[in-house]
């Protein structure tokens, strides 16, 4: 069936079995960052609207409801190598090659993060399928990753550039990210679309249960941080603010997945200096994390680089006020003076001032928490994100 559109006849995709192959490093149960959370919820929401296949890193896993998932492990390229410095980029590259060995019959390939961009590039060349990439962060703007990847950082930058510049469409998770993409890469501005991250409003909401706090030995009054042990996440700036915070308020760092052993050792050492710092060196399960969001006095996101910052949505959905850095996509999520406070990144003194204001004025904190929940309900549902993404796929297929 077709639909007339001016002088051009285009497929009526309402009646076509539109399908997408999503390529990702992270997929449940192996999710440790915002990009993985995004893929998890987006794929589930899209599966209500269309056919979804997910190709991901890792061992074979149980099939998710409503879609198909295929897992791919890296080739052991480095077992006999003389120089293992490049393994952190070469091993993902081997997974990218494995991902395209199985024929792709979907209408669109959608890749997330540089870890899979070469798979998308190869899929476009081999199978002629349109390619869309979602940019969750930009390698050129994360120079500290050279500490994590070593010399392979140059290869990760090349993989990202190659995938992005070959894309038929590029999704930016914030307006700020779109500006950064256009600065870093040779991409037609018309191809770059902004689709924000979302959140499951039924799942992320305030919980009255306080069992998790007791389980982890957390004080009644606490400031919550959630994120990887990474310089990007600003964890050292929050630790730098501790001397200016009340001694009876605990700073709780839910910080797993260290970038490097050196960064982990540094975080552990700094945290140990303060009796009111509680370091939880693991990725706290979602159900327990929602409880911790719900009962925190304040949520703190001190990132120095954050294209979106889905953790702020999670805290706001649980009616907790947010103090965050005025960077990237955070400024499109947290409304300064309404749902929390924004401070300049890398300034522990400013961070402490904002945190103390909310710790002292609990009525202000309550109002900001309520306003945060309302904002999330109005603008950041996954169903909305999925429909916008589905519509972009349709556009790509029509103009192919």
Label the model's feature ranges.
Residues 298, 321-324, 334:
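Short hydrophobic beta-strand element within catalytic cores of glycosyltransferases
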């Amino acid at each position: 069936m077709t639909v007339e559109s001016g002088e051009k006849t285009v497929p009526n995709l309402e009646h076509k079995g539109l399908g997408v192959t999503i390529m990702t490093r992270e997929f449940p149960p192996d999710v440790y960052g915002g990009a993985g959370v995004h893929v998890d919820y987006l794929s589930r929401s899209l599966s209500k609207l269309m056919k979804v296949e997910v190709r991901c890193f890792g061992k074979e896993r149980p099939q998710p409801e409503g879609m198909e998932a295929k897992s791919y492990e890296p080739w052991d390229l480095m077992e006999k190598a003389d120089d293992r410095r490049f393994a952190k980029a070469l091993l993902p590259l081997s997974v990218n090659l494995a991902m395209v060995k199985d024929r792709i019959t979907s209408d669109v390939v959608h890749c997330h993060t540089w870890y899979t961009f070469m798979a998308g590039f190869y899929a476009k060349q081999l199978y002629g399928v349109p390619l869309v990439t979602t940019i969750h962060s930009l390698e050129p703007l994360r120079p500290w990753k050279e500490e994590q990847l070593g010399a392979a950082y140059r290869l990760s930058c090349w993989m990202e550039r190659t995938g992005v510049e070959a894309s038929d469409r590029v999704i930016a998770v914030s307006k700020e990210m779109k500006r950064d993409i256009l600065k870093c890469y040779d991409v037609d501005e018309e191809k770059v679309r902004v689709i924000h991250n979302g959140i499951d409003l039924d799942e992320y909401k305030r919980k009255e249960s306080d069992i998790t706090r007791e389980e982890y030995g957390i004080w009644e009054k606490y400031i919550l941080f959630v994120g990887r042990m990474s310089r990007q996440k600003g964890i050292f700036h929050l630790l730098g603010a501790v001397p200016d915070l009340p001694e009876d308020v605990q700073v709780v760092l839910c910080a797993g997945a260290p970038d490097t052993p050196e960064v982990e050792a540094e975080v552990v050492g700094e945290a140990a200096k303060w009796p009111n710092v509680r370091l939880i060196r693991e990725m706290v399960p979602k159900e327990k994390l929602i409880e911790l969001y719900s009962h925190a006095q304040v949520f703190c996101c001190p990132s120095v680089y954050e294209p979106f910052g889905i953790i702020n949505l999670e805290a706001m959905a649980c009616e907790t006020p947010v103090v965050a850095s005025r960077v990237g996509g955070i400024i499109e999520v947290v409304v300064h003076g309404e749902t929390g406070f924004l401070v300049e990144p890398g300034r522990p003194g400013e961070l402490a001032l904002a945190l103390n204001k909310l710790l002292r004025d609990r009525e202000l904190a309550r109002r900001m928490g309520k306003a945060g929940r309302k904002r999330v309900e109005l603008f950041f549902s996954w169903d909305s994100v999925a429909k916008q993404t589905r519509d972009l796929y349709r556009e790509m297929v029509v103009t192919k």
